[in-house]
Amino acid sequence: MSRIVLAEAYRTPIGVFGGVFKDIPAYELGATVIRQILEHSQIDPNEINEVILGNVLQAGQGQNPARIAAIHGGVPEAVPSFTVNKVCGSGLKAIQLAYQSIVAGDNEIVIAGGMESMSQSPMLLKNSRFGFKMGNQTLEDSMIADGLTDKFNDYHMGITAENLVEQYQISRKEQDQFAFDSQQKASRAQQAGVFDAEIVPVEVPQRKGDPLIISQDEGIRPQTTIDKLAQLRPAFKKDGSVTAGNASGINDGAAAMLVMTEDKAKALGLQPIAVLDSFGASGVAPSIMGIGPVEAIHKALKRSNKVINDVDIFELNEAFAAQSIAVNRELQLPQDKVNVNGGAIALGHPIGASGARTLVSLLHQLSDAKPTGVASLCIGGGQGIATVVSKYEV
């Protein structure tokens, strides 16, 4: 069978919570990336067989946000679309589903990725549909409820990171150092233009005058210092060590790519970036969900007949510094291969988009000298997902 390849991989800049993208729905961020894929590839949009996009915080957007993003992005109405929710793994799961649909013979070319607007997630007034007889009622934050809370233990994702702190005896100093390093790496990469090739500028309409053109990630903090990080209070536990500074942000963004057969790429005159080698998924205790990538990576590597030492680049989502440190310890990863341009602590974590974002960033780093990469994420509820890719060679 023809190999499954990836091409035209892009992402939006990542906006901070309540920042530059606060008035832009997730589906419009997704549409921006889809539009770029179609315009840059110059393929006939009718060639697309399906659009699959991850999106976690869907409430209030309208039916099937992936469908809205696809049509707004220029995909014909005749092309079907569907939306995936695997929490933080949604964007990468969408790409896996595209891969599987092609292997099954259902599709030849798919746009797949993820999108999220955490800024636009609504407040919920539960049990209000049929009215209240008496008493006060409380609004529920859909972002916290559907994106950041472990339903099994009824606590915030930050507590799952604190659980790993205890299990792996991770110090506050280690976490702050990890966060500082992420910020510094991302800042250097941004200043050097490393992200320019993967980022699609986004137009943000203004009340008066021309729209703002946003072309850089909003949340990178080059002025962060170890001392400033050390001054932050624990965010989730009275005597804890997980803070707003050593955890990923709350963000808005989108990322996507073309997934297709090698034969289809040749027929359309497209130059693939990479070959999709394998995927892996895991289930772990929800209370330590952050360790999920370990088994997922092992499974993905085994399916591609590779081991850790065969991998040149790791893009691992930094949900929390503690979680990342635990995964790195378990896998004994060489740190000069991991998130060399920073990760989600600096860049941000728009949950439905991050799976695709990590892979987009990985694809743009592949080279003849570093041809093999792994992208992986932990997933709320106690799961992990990973993929192995290799630089495309004819």
Curated annotation (Swiss-Prot):
CDD domains: thiolase
Catalytic activity: 2 acetyl-CoA = acetoacetyl-CoA + CoA
UniProt enzyme class: transferase
InterPro entries: Thiolase (IPR002155), Thiolase-like (IPR016039), Thiolase_acyl_enz_int_AS (IPR020615), Thiolase_AS (IPR020610), Thiolase_C (IPR020617), Thiolase_CS (IPR020613), Thiolase_N (IPR020616)
Pfam families, A to Z: Thiolase_C, Thiolase_N
GO cellular component: cytoplasm
GO MF term set: acetyl-CoA C-acetyltransferase activity
Active site: 88 (acyl-thioester intermediate), 349 (proton acceptor), 378 (proton acceptor)
The protein, known as: Probable acetyl-CoA acyltransferase
EC number annotated for this UniProt entry: 2.3.1.9
Places the protein is found: Cytoplasm
Keywords attached to this entry: Acyltransferase, Cytoplasm, Transferase
Family to which this protein belongs: Belongs to the thiolase-like superfamily. Thiolase family.
Main location: cytoplasm
PROSITE patterns the UniProt entry points to: THIOLASE_1, THIOLASE_2, THIOLASE_3
